[in-house]
Amino acid sequence: VIDCLYRRLAADGEFQLFESTDGTRSNWDPEIQHGSPPLALMTKLIEELAADSGLRVGRLTLDILGAIPVTQVRVRAWVQRPGSRISMMAAEMSAPAPGGAERTVARVTAWLLATSDTADVVTDRFPPLVEGEAAAVPHSWVGAKGYLETVRWRRQQVAEGESNVAWLSPRVPLVDSEAPTDLQRLAMVADSINGVGMALEPDKFVFMNTDTVVHVHRLPAGNDFGLRARASIGPDGIGVTTAEIFDRQGFIGVVAQTLLVQRRT
């Protein structure tokens, strides 16, 4: 039974050690991790580092630097660019390479900004997204083990030609039984826009993302997230997926990914 994504092991200097559970396994390859768990774990360390800064995250960028194995990982966070109004913080994850040497497999950078009262001028580009009746999920990942078991998916009915919409809710905690923050919960599903917005059949094409960039003009609230996503595929094997993100209160931000598109042979 998958009851969390990572188990906390110990500290090693500036690094924290975690054991990756089966809940991190990718639907592309069960030997590597889905992008959302590493994004969420590094977001957690960045939020902990920023706890007394008076700043909050406005953007998260995950760069996947190589295949992330489902094994023990080492994670650290640091201040890349200090500032009282604008600061960049970063985190990286390292894991053993096939030859045994340790290498950095993923990195997250975050812009953190000072907050002030702008409640009287709040503006949203999109009206709130309301969850409707769940539709069938017509792709070959239905029933896939690993990460997809840790998220409750409700794909929505949309008209032909419109962006795909799905509501996602994490089913398990991020680390052990620790309660994740709402931003960490969002990070636990944000990388899934690739699956929500896919324009190709995964049994005919591989379209893996190299990054995930999340912008939030408002911090999320709750455990339910609506993703309205759509992929664009170029003529030379490169694509982009973009999405709007919603919680139960309304529009909260956008996500974008770069895709490597390859035809299966």
Residue ranges and their predicted role:
Residues V1-T265:
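Terminal targeting signals and extreme-terminal segments of soluble enzymes
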